[in-house]
């Protein structure tokens, strides 16, 4: 007996001997289902920025019931750094921490038919803001003769073009990657009020802005002016000097 199409009926079978004697009729339920299930509709609670998420994304699915054998959802979450794999049947594994992940999802019915389509996405998760440090050469003071500042920006997912430096000083070194951070230097030479602010944004859209307290550069020597006497002149009476 060959069944070449979807079938869900009882098949009656009876054996007959060569002598013509008929056996008892047996009822055998036969279910054949060859249609492949549709892929479930996958949803995420947020929109990524170029594949990057600033919050841990949560995925859900909508699987509509249709005629035929029951359909199940199969999901696999792979940590691309550690190669750790989490799997789920009728549930999507949750991302628990920052990192880079690949999510694969398909559906399969109880007859073994698997969906032709595969949902696959890569998630880059970074929930931390960049860190910015400013280190001064001279102790901080409201008035200084000279100052130099080293600026350090740390973030695993930072691009050189995503840092903005605004200052009244002079940037003497371009941004340069040094190990796990970017750094630059600013010097303050001109007299007057000095300002410094730094902004950094990572690939996930996390931002950090610092505005340093202003200070004054004063390179001028004190000037002394004496009034009430003339140079080289003698006086017979007391004089008042200012």
Task: Give the predicted meaning of each segment.
Residues 1-242:
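Low-complexity, disordered linker/stalk regions enriched in Pro/Thr/Ser/Gly
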């Amino acid at each position: 007996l060959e069944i070449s199409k979807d079938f869900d009926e009882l098949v009656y079978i009876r054996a007959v001997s060569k002598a013509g004697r008929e056996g008892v009729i047996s009822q055998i339920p036969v279910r054949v289902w060859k249609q492949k299930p549709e892929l479930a509709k996958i949803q995420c609670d947020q929109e990524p920025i170029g594949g990057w998420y600033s919050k841990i994304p949560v995925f859900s699915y909508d699987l509509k019931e249709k005629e035929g054998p029951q359909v199940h959802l199969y999901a696999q979450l792979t940590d691309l750094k550690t190669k750790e794999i989490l799997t789920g049947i009728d549930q999507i594994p949750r991302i628990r921490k920052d990192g880079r992940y690949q999510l694969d999802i398909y559906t399969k019915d109880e007859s073994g038919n698997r969906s032709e389509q595969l949902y696959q996405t890569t998630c880059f998760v970074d929930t931390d803001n960049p860190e910015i440090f400013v280190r001064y050469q001279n102790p901080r003071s409201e008035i200084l003769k000279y100052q130099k500042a080293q600026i350090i920006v740390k973030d695993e997912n930072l691009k050189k073009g995503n840092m903005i430096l605004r200052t009244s000083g002079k940037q003497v070194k371009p941004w340069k990657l040094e190990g796990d951070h970017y750094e630059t230097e600013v010097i303050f030479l001109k007299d007057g009020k000095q300002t410094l602010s730094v902004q950094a944004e990572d690939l996930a859209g996390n931002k950090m802005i610092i505005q340093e307290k202003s200070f004054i550069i004063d390179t001028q020597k004190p000037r002394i002016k004496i009034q009430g006497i003339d140079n080289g002149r003698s006086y017979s009476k007391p004089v008042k000097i200012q």
